[in-house]
């Protein structure tokens, strides 16, 4: 009788352990198959808005290892370009005074006078730089993003752009490109521009002409070697430039891309919701606008589709920077 009780107890323990094991396996299976789950959402307690929450890339999506001659896009690697620096000592005396770019807040479907003056200054002085399309007769818009680092929303942005068939330019630093090659390859293969935002994101007016060229060339070399890609569009880190810097960028074959529409979207501690992003951007749109958004902003990622739809309803046409008129 005692032996029967012991056997029953042992059988009960085995059944309990088996049930626990199956439960744990189910939890693990749930964690390892995020594709079967809907994208998580979060509700902003201040506004009551529900927004999508970006999830981190799974381990299997991390940076692959390239073999000799391969690129992340499958395109053939491009030959490296030697940037010959004209007047490396700036003997011509071009101003090296730091200018913090200012564009003004556009209202009423017209660019702010500051943006108009900026474009006139670039054109009148022969700089290969632009912030505003004053030539096209269409209501053109040029959508650009600054991508200093990855915050999990670039994939959502690319999905929206693909759905809406809208071209964009992504100005990336070298660490962003090195750490997220799949995202960069997707940008390129889906027809977007990957712009040059420098290697280390320094303030260009503090650099020599040779150092400026090295910052641009380092990024260009990496894109050519690892992605078989190069486009001559540059954006100054922090929007800080000088006459000397503008001249240098143009002298090595690049065009400096500024903007006429933007807002304070980069501060992750001060995101104000999808509706705020939509209202702010649409209120500032105007024909010929170069729009600057930051890819780290969840508000931008969630509002982008609505912004595009609204703009098109108003007769705007989205174009690539490759279509921007020569100044």
List the model feature ranges, each with a label.
Residues 2, 128-130, 276-280:
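A generic local structural motif
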Residues 4-23:
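Sec-dependent N-terminal signal peptides of Gram-positive bacterial secreted proteins and lipoproteins
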Residues 17, 193, 203, 218-219, ...:
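Short, intrinsically disordered/low-complexity patches at protein termini
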Residues 97-99, 139-141, 151-158, 162-292, ...:
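Metal-dependent polysaccharide deacetylase catalytic core of the NodB/CE4 family, i.e.
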């Amino acid at each position: 009788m005692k032996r029967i009780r012991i056997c029953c107890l042992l059988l009960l323990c085995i059944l309990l352990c088996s049930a626990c094991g199956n439960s744990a396996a189910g939890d693990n299976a749930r964690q390892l198959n995020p594709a079967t789950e809907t994208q998580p959402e979060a509700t902003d307690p201040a506004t009551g808005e529900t927004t999508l929450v970006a999830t981190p890339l799974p381990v299997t999506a991390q940076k692959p290892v390239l073999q000799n001659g391969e690129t992340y896009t499958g395109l053939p690697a491009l030959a490296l370009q030697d940037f010959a620096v004209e007047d490396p000592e700036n003997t011509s005396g071009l101003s090296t005074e730091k200018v913090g770019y200012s564009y003004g807040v556009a209202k009423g479907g017209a660019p702010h006078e500051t943006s108009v003056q900026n474009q006139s200054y670039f054109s009148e002085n022969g700089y290969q730089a632009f912030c505003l399309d004053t030539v096209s007769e269409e209501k053109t818009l040029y959508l650009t993003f600054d991508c200093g680092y990855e915050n999990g929303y670039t994939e959502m942005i690319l999905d929206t752009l693909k759905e809406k068939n809208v071209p964009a330019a992504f100005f990336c630093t070298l660490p962003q490109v090195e750490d997220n090659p799949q995202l960069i390859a997707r940008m390129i293969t889906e027809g977007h521009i990957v712009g040059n935002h420098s290697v280390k994101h320094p303030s260009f007016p503090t650099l020599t002409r040779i150092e400026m060229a090295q910052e641009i060339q380092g990024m260009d070399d990496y894109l050519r070697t690892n992605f078989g890609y190069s486009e001559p569009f540059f954006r100054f880190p922090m929007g800080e430039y000088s006459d000397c810097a503008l001249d240098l960028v143009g002298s090595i074959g690049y065009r400096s891309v500024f903007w006429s529409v933007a807002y304070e979207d980069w501060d992750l501690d001060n995101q104000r919701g999808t509706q705020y992003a939509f209202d702010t951007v649409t209120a500032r749109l105007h024909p010929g606008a170069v729009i600057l958004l930051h890819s780290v902003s969840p508000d931008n990622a969630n509002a982008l589709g609505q912004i595009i739809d609204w703009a098109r309803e108003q007769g705007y046409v989205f174009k690539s920077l490759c279509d921007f008129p020569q100044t």
